[in-house]
């Protein structure tokens, strides 16, 4: 009861301190760092890092107040130092809560304005609570524990600074150790973020247990009766529940860290190919397979049943290997209705573990199994690819159903029937030429979709999508994008941009290798950091269609032209990949993409418009580049700190790719005889026979096709 009476007094004293309000004010404005700093390119992340450091400093400042004023003996005579510690901690936490609430209120209208029509209040609240809100108590606990161990101001500040610096530097790529700045590389605007938010929450709560345990241990070391830390520990620990509580918190932290369900234990050596080079079984073939998949979109888990029709002509028992996504459990494995032994390896590679099943010597074997669980990811720094919610999901290969590793296909390949049951608002999109159809509707608000495919694995997307059917370039294009992004897409003229790009590029360069059929799917994915393609489908990254990207003047004169730019990458960048010529070369997919965008815009809006918004802009930026101080005096660039040097180098490199290279291609166009000649050259490069060992388009290949040298393309 005494503690309850002391708490409002301590909180009132804290809120009457000018230092407290200065820290609160700085915390409220700290998210602005995220608008200008690429390292923490999110206001909530920046606010958490900066606010955490600020409240760590405030904690040491407040705990040292009595010692700094030389009244510690008097205050300890009035209030036990143990009681004072139990009152000061919640008072500091309450001040941190006040700072968080004020920050969220101040940044709510700012975030609404910056994000626009796709602003999601739920994501906003969760992002600030997890990225910023939980950083403040962690910092307070860490700083308070350091002070209670040392009972002086200077050493705790050094320890806390080192602890924060470790999180921001050495531990930055370790999602479980970066306690101050969660390892969050991007949040989706159009789809859900449950997976990455759960991961951040898990990390924060794990650290909360650990730092609470350290604080409880430091609480035992608070100086009493003139004793040192060990003597005080022995005295305070007489009440057994105190050390037991500290030990329990630390043990729970260790267990939580070891039992994390998000990241697998795949071999970090990306050149490892143990599973890929597995010898196929002689005399065993897969005639057909099927899977019935039922994701739980609320829990983010998957449950399914897989069946494989195998032909075993060896007359002997065989061991079939299948790839299983880590996080899944396997059960009820049967061959022709009889349970058979199986095992799952501890070794993992490329987000797969090996399931081995013994099948009988019978010629026709129906292998069935049940699988399910929370699918784990293999890339801790880019979590979110296995998002599974009522708004979006992506199940790839073994995450969709266990993948045969050492069984060859039959005469008809790997014919497969996949069924998946999802909420009615979700549209199922097989990544490929297959088309899904609804085969059943259920009373619980779900539908069952079915599609046929012919692969050992496969990728399936599903979400709250809008589908537009577009006729262009002799193809029927099914353009899928998130419903939340519909207004942005319509304002940017997405359908018209798709039509213009496909008509132009297919007519001038040739059809896409992965669009050789009558239909092509263009699918907007959740933010992934890039795209890829297979026969009949191509992926478009959500990041290409954000309001910020569509307003990038370096890619076009308006949102519609930036949309054209991003779609041209289906030809230059995805249909034809480019080599990395190094930091000193402007050669990349962006050069030909900008040039092609210019040509399309020239056809649509005329030469004067294209010259003003593209060529003149490129020339102006190139002139500024050659006048840049660090370009003229590179020795000064080398003298800068690494972070500053990289920021400047990346900026200059981007200018060369987006402006200098298009001008070089434009000059090459003049030297080879005009637009028609350049179109013929690019058509030949696009349709050249690829070297499977190095399928990249190089700058030298471009120069050779034009009959030019690098010196010929030197800009005046």
Annotate each language-model stretch with its function.
Residues 348-350, 418, 471-581, 585, ...:
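Juxtacatalytic substrate-recognition/specificity segment
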Residues 504, 644-716:
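Amphipathic alpha-helical substructures
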Residues 590-663, 671, 692:
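Acidic/His/Gly-enriched intrinsically disordered linker/tail segments
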Residues 43-71, 99, 306, 369:
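Long, hydrophobic alpha-helical segments
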Residues 317-319, 327-387, 440-448:
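A surface-exposed beta-strand-loop module
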Residues 370-462:
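Extended, low-hydrophobicity, Ser/Thr/Pro/Gly-biased non-transmembrane segments
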Residues 177-203, 230-301:
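N-terminal, polar/Ser/Thr-rich
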Residues 410-412, 548-627:
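Zinc-dependent metallopeptidase catalytic helix centered on the HExxH motif
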